[in-house]
Each structure stands twice: as structure tokens, then as C-alpha cells.
Amino acid sequence: MNSMLHIESNLLQIERSIEQIDIKGQYINLASPIYLSGQLNINELLAQYSNNIAQSDTSSVLQIGVDEAGRGPLLGSVNVASAILPRAWSGLIEGQPLKDTPLSILTDSKQLSEKKRDMLYPLVQQHAIGYVIADIPAAVIDQVNILQATMLGMRLCTEVMLEVIAYHLNDMAQDVHQLHAEVLFDGNRCPELNYARLVELGVEEKVDCQAWIKGDARHTSIAAASILAKVSRDKTMYALDAQHPEYGIAKHKGYPTRAHMEAIETYGVLAAHRRSFAPVRKALKR
């Protein structure tokens, strides 16, 4: 795993390239690197951590929302994001914790127009205490299947977030054992985290993983992650569209529309197509 951390002012910039992954004690060479990027606001982390401990005298609770975008398309990556909002902003959407904040319109990204998602994307990045975005390429999806690729992305976004938080709390002479992380995953299951890594970080007993069905429409932290995942994936689709305008990728975003299937039939299968998906397999056999 290639890791890069840049500190600009109080913002820690996160960049990771993962070529090999430990799954249940076995290292697997990935068919293509998984790229992660993100940011941690160190001052805001310390302020919230200290404030939470002062109020409870026991622990500091951070809520990490995690969501994905792009499981259904035939083309390109599946993107996953984790996000930590300020504690007062993190909660059930119906409770309106974002009222009168810059993120007041935030909800499930699928319920928002592309214009509103694009508007929220930099605002989430600006106001989040921390976030991580993972890009899991088609080659890895084909290697492990789309469900496992998504779970892997969720796991990595969570572990990288916890790692940089634990590292900087220790660096600032804070007791990391007082950290309690509630990790809220959109969907009906949680990924299996690398327990050995959590032990190394000293947080193995303080990570509470929760599966939230339709969580992106229920919890602000998951909705924030949903925006990051969706817009980051759209950006990769627009980049592919610029390289292959004849496929109309900007319109269908890789989903199996009639126009997309006709483009595959006319121009063939691209390197970024998911060969493990039935329509692409069928096209390759022609």
C-alpha cells in the first residue's frame, strides 16, 4: 500500500494507492490499484474530541457515514465514501440537524438533482471533519464480484479514516482509547473489518458497525457520504466520456440503457467495461 499524507494548514490531505489487500490473513494482489483520497480537519477533530469527552467524562463518539455509488452500471468503477460531519450536524434527517447550515438541503443523493449534488459536493468536503473516497476499478470488480468490491471499498474507507484519526489523536497526546466510533453503513450488511489492524490502532473494542437500510435517506452522515460517492463517480464518467464520446457515457453514466448497449454493439467493449457483467460477457462472445 502506497500512502501519502500532506498537511496544509490544519487540513490533512489523504492519498492512498492499494495494490495488495489482506483478507482474513491472506494477501491478495489486486488486478488494478484501488485509489483513495480524502481529508481530515485536524483542529476540528481535536475540538470535537475534547468537547465530547468533557461532556461525557468517558468517551468521544464520532459517527462515520459510509455509502457507495455505481453498483449497477456495466462500465467503470464503483465508488465508496466515508464522511464525518460535525457532531451537531450528524443525526436522523427527520430531526433536521442540518437546518440553517450550509448543508440544509442534504438528503439521499438519488433524490437530488445533479445540479444540487454538484453544489453540495464541495460543501460536504469543506464542512466535514473528515472524509475518504475510494475508487474501485472495473478490473477489481471482475476479480472479486461487485458485492465484494463494494464491501472492500466500504472497509477501506472506514479503516483509512480510523487510521488517520487514531494516528493524529496519538500525535496530539490524546488518549485514543477514549474514541468511540459508530460506523453507519448504508444497506443491509456491514463489511468485515481487519480486526488485527484495529488492534494495532487501539480501537478494536470501540468500533460499532451498524447497517442502515435506506440509510442515505435517513441519516445525515450517510447522506453526506452518498453525495461524495455519487459525484466522484460521475466525475470519472465524464472523464471517460471525453475519451470515448461515441459511447454517450455522459448521459447514461455506464448504466445498461438502450443507447449504451447499441454503442457497445457498434464500437465494442472498452477496457473500463465490467467483463463479469452478463451484457458485457455476451457482447464479448459475438
Swiss-Prot record:
A divalent metal cation binds at D67, E68, D186. Its cofactor is Mn(2+); Mg(2+). GO terms for biological process: DNA replication, removal of RNA primer; mismatch repair. SUPFAM superfamilies: Ribonuclease H-like. It catalyses: Endonucleolytic cleavage to 5'-phosphomonoester. Pfam families: RNase_HII. Manganese or magnesium. Binds 1 divalent metal ion per monomer in the absence of substrate. May bind a second metal ion after substrate binding. GO terms for molecular function: manganese ion binding; RNA binding; RNA-DNA hybrid ribonuclease activity. Its EC number is 3.1.26.4. NCBIfam families: PRK00015.1-3 (NF000595). Belongs to the RNase HII family. Endonuclease that specifically degrades the RNA of RNA-DNA hybrids. This is Ribonuclease HII. It comes from Psychrobacter cryohalolentis (strain ATCC BAA-1226 / DSM 17306 / VKM B-2378 / K5). The lineage of its organism: Bacteria, Pseudomonadati, Pseudomonadota, Gammaproteobacteria, Moraxellales.
